[in-house]
Amino acid sequence: VINASDDPLVAEIWTSDAWQAYPTVQTGEHQSTFTEGHIDYEEKLQSIFSVVPIEQQESIIWSVKNNGNAKSAIAVISSNDKTQKYRVAIEWIEQQGWKPVQVEVLNTLEGTY
């Protein structure tokens, strides 16, 4: 679903019931982390890039951070040339992994992370 946005920073908002959690290999109690190279962080990135039309190796990751609680995160990413800009929200689903919940197509990177 594509919706318009009232936010001047956001061109449109994408959501989809078809988006699935990125399958986790983590076991035991989930600990959210934002340390590059940690399995939880890498799974966050896999989930984020599964719903945008750019490849991780052709992108700039501006921020990945907590989105209000330990079971949610938000990232701002762009293509290397900065023509494609996105803010992606994900949520942790127990025993499944990180699931994308919303993509905002950004008009600008300024003030978005």
Locations of regions flagged by a protein language model:
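A broad structural signal for short, well-ordered beta-strand segments within beta-sheet-rich domains
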Residues: 5-12, 54-61, 100
